[in-house]
Amino acid sequence: MSGRTQAALYAEIDHELSWSERDLPQHVRTKHVHRLHPYLGKFVPQLAETLLRRSLAAGSVVYDPFAGSGTTLVEANALGIRAIGADVSAFNCLLMRVKVARHNLTALRRDLDRALAAPPADPPPSEWLARWYAPAALRDLAGFCSAIPGSDEPETLAVVASRAARSARLAAHHDLDMPRAPVLGPYACHKHRRECRPVERADHFLRRYATDTVQRLAEFDDVRTAADVEVVHADARTIDLPERIDGIVTSPPYPGLIDYHEQHRYAYELLGLNDRRELELGAAAAGTARGALDAYCDGIAETLARARPAFGPEATAAVVVNDRRDLYDEIARRAGYSIARRDVRHVNRRTGRRAGEYFEQILWLRPVRPRRGARAA
């Protein structure tokens, strides 16, 4: 999209896919399980819902090879669409499984009460945890986590612990998305417009998020359907889809923007999750030099090409991108797709202290199929 004037871009906007903060406030964007745990770079649920409605019917199968926090999977289930989501991140898959699973809420409340009543405990040995938490906060978290192995809902308790761990870090309130260094004394808080102090305990976060988790799971129960959801913890460049799919709805990582494993480092350290950050595509740590962009294009093209054999005859892929480097024409070609249509949406709100606006494209891809009668080379 480089070289386009802003006036030209505004003229192409699909207003059904573009919302202002007034049209779509945060509490609406983060309905039910979508706010089960903060996730930087989350797919807007209403965008996923609109793309699913436009391209798929109830009973069909959608695939998200970059499933992230599970937005496509949750929205697909609510529409009666079967969903398969893949992600290389252990934390992402944990969060997705909790969002889409059916829960015994009575048993969950019991297990949460037990975990909240557990005494503070010694945390796992970790220099990172010791650096980012006050000792009492870390012992609160470790005490709660000590109840996870005996729970009937261990993964749900793990998500509650992770969410509390995010809030209890020695980080400024206005800088929870990507804090760079621990805050060890009073600071001017841009979020609360006053002087704040570092967090010393985690128990109040655990209580608050335990209650909120049960409420959000119950809210999703009111709209969920019987449609199957499968979460695959794997590199989407290497998996074989087990069945035909009727479409893709996905938002791939943008190059050089977010380190998804590092974003949730607290969960990996506290819960002992397997860190596979070396397999991330477009990680911020890799930068945006030519070599990094080439590797990114290779990875996205391999992922889309891997899914192509499973496409049904009318299947399309809706791929949401901020393609300011004009990478996706070549990615689509190399993956064996043509771009049938481009929709443009205006994004004018961002989380935390980040401000500004930008444009995203929704690329509608179709597999390039051999023409009938064409001779093999």
Could you describe each region identified by the protein language model?
Residues P253-G299:
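Mobile active-site "lid"/loop adjacent to the S-adenosyl-L-methionine
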Residues C297-P313, A332:
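A short glycine-rich, Lys/Arg-flanked "PGG" loop and its adjoining helix->strand segment in the class I
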Residues A48, S60-L79, A83-A90, M96, ...:
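Conserved proline-anchored active-site loop of SAM-dependent methyltransferases
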Residues L141-T250, P255-I258:
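SAM-dependent nucleic-acid methyltransferase catalytic core
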Residues M1-A58:
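S-adenosyl-L-methionine
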Residues V61, E314-A318:
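Short glycine-centered segments of the SAM/dcSAM-binding site in methyltransferase folds
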Residues N322-R333, Y337-A377:
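Class I S-adenosyl-L-methionine
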Residues A90-E153, L273-A286:
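Conserved phosphoryl-transfer catalytic core
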